[in-house]
Amino acid sequence: MPVGTEAIRKVDFLAGTGNRFVAEGKRQLFGEVGIDLFAGPTESLVLADETADPFTVATDLISQAGHGPDTPAVLITTCPKVGRETIEIVNKLLSATDLSTPDVAKVSWDAFGEVIIVDTLKELWELGDHYASEQVQVFTKDPRDALDKMSNYGALFLGENTCVSYGDKVIGKNHVLLTRTTARYTGGLWVGKYLKTCTYQEVTSPESSGKLGRLCGRAARPERFEAHARSGDLQANRHM
């Protein structure tokens, strides 16, 4: 696609999800063609208070850890009891024999799983924003508070009725999202990525062109761009 064939014209832009091999392909082709963004392994973050159900938290963390052996699955909670019970349930679920990816999920959880206890909801929102995770589930009494309290994430999943697996499979969530804290400064794939801006300049007034020419000379010479200055001088001498 990026180089074309005898039958297919070379493309100008590559977009879409993929594993680490797709990401490496994009990296190597960056500059040869445009790309949507560089995305790392899937990330899942759960923000929970004392109202959260530990079994639901554990189930959803494992569902995402099964994506690959390098998938971060993190719980931040204000409730130590929720944290402890989540860890216990995760370990039990990972020992189940009916999971299709238990070994993958266990490797991921052992290497990248985290359970963090904070004292207040304020700390919960702040630390969640600091993580800037790809997918953030909010299991709090008022999950919509996250819309006002947070700004760094790929996608929010509000309430225990909204699991990340829905986003993966059935509710049409954007699948090209930010990972590795890049949500701190940009957003995921959107329609603007498929558009480009073209501009043009035209000075229609000779007098204005002359005045701009004098200004151009004064701006260019201190920077030692004499050729720039002379281009402006030409217009100034012609029209002033």
Curated annotation (Swiss-Prot):
Any single Pfam family the record assigns to this protein: Histidinol_dh
Annotated binding of Zn(2+), by residue: Q64, H67, D168, H228
GO-annotated biological processes: L-histidine biosynthetic process
Pathway(s) of this molecule: Secondary metabolite biosynthesis
GO cellular component, one term: cytosol
Assigned keywords, A-Z: Metal-binding, Oxidoreductase, Zinc
Catalytic residues, chain numbering: E134 (proton acceptor)
GO MF annotation, one: NAD binding
Cofactor: Zn(2+)
EC code: 1.1.-.-
Co-factor binding comment: Binds 1 zinc ion per subunit.
InterPro entries named among the record's database cross-references: Ald_DH/histidinol_DH (IPR016161), Hstdl_DH (IPR012131)
Annotated S-S bridges: none
Superkingdom: Eukaryota
Residues passing through the membrane, by range: none
Purpose: Histidinol dehydrogenase homolog; part of the gene cluster that mediates the biosynthesis of oryzines, natural products with an unusual maleidride backbone. The two subunits of the fungal fatty acid synthase oryfasA and oryfasB probably form octenoic acid. This fatty acid is most likely activated by the acyl-CoA ligase oryP to give octenyl-CoA before the citrate synthase-like protein oryE catalyzes condensation with oxaloacetate to form tricarboxylic acid.
Family according to the record: Belongs to the histidinol dehydrogenase family.
PANTHER family with a match to the protein in the record: HISTIDINOL DEHYDROGENASE (PTHR21256:SF14), HISTIDINOL DEHYDROGENASE HDH (PTHR21256)
Record-given protein name: Histidinol dehydrogenase homolog oryD
Organism of this sequence: Aspergillus oryzae (strain ATCC 42149 / RIB 40)
